[in-house]
Amino acid sequence: MATRNAGRGTLCVSWIGVAKFFLADWRLSCIFLVPPSVVLYFVHSSKGLLFLLSALALVPLAAILGGATEELAIHAGPAAGGLTNATLGNAPELVLGFFLLRAGHIEALKASITGSIIGELLLVFGLAVFLGGIGREKQVFNRVAVGASTTMLVLAVVGLVMPALFDLSVFGSMQPGGAATERLSFLTAPILIGSYFASFIFIFRTHRDLFRSPVRASAQVTAAATLLVLVVCGGLIAFESAVLVGGIESVTHALGWTERFVGLFVIAIIGNAAEHSTAVTMAIKDKMDLALNIALGSSTQVALFVAPLLVIASHFTQHRMSLVFPLLEVLAVVISVTVATLVSFDGETNWFEGVLLISVYAILAVFFFYSPAA
């Protein structure tokens, strides 16, 4: 009897932890939008309305999935936890990207990848530096960790620039659908993914002392409850992503926007909204190492893991995707990586540097808004 009561007590504590997890984050206030979006989908409501509801519903779902992934990473330990964060942490972007790929929205898909990278490096990094720097002369952070992230982003730039340069030098124009380019992209993708996972050996094995957190977090929820949250949340993200992709054409026609702009500044922001707020919150608390790890780490994950993985996945669908991005998007990524590197190379930031980062993002947004479809 005592054992049975102990088991019930453990189960009760577990689900109390789940409840606290759901109530602790203001981003989860949008979770009430999930049921209406499901109901309206099955009654065949307006696709524009469904696009809006599903976009807003993805924000809390991404936050829940991110929190559950961190809980699972704590249970798994430092090394395995890093691998868990690398894979499951990108689930919202991967799921949304897969549905865009399956629907043939290649332009929007590539734009969302570009938008995620420049959004993290300029908008999120900029907001974190600006809001964190208010009332402080400067904020300092680990230069080694940031240096590793920016170096990996340079590799991502090489992976994006070389396919485009190949097309320009061989064919005289950028043809993202060419057989040769698709083959080269397919061969380049595993190299980018391999380099990304090699970084975990650097962080968690050979140079772990440089990246060790001063405080080790403890799990708040049992592993079983965490896995259940991951499964349910993953299914809902897949559903909402499918609904959102189905409404892209309606939104572009109604608002007069291009698929490129929607991908760059709507889908990209939605997919990373949960991480955006976390990075800014950490910076305000003067935890710049965590803030920069989120901003720079997320852009690295998208460039070296999400994008090449979608390239490989496209070879198993009807719509092929290459690493040849439109020239304006490639230039935007190069500019973003350059500016972010210049701001972070000295290991300290101030609020004015945040203003500069946000200004660059705003300039890019203006030019992309008025640029024609790719």
Where are the regions that the model predicts?
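Alpha-helical transmembrane bundles of multi-pass secondary active transporters
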Residues: 1-67, 121-246, 255, 325, ...
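Membrane-interface interhelical loops and short amphipathic "cap" helices
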Residues: 101-107, 175-177, 251-255
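Residue-level signature of catalytic and energy-coupling elements of molecular machines
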Residues: 72, 118, 196, 252, ...
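Loop-to-helix transition at the N-terminal end of transmembrane alpha-helices
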Residues: 47-61, 76-86, 255-265
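Helix-loop-helix junctions within the multi-pass membrane cores of secondary transporters/permeases
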Residues: 27, 81-133, 262-321, 335
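Long, well-ordered mid-to-C-terminal structural blocks that present hydrophobic/aromatic surfaces
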Residues: 233-278
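Helix-loop interface residues and adjacent transmembrane-helix termini in multi-pass membrane transporters
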Residues: 45, 75-76, 102, 258, ...
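Short amphipathic alpha-helical coupling elements at transmembrane boundaries
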Residues: 67-74, 78, 250-254
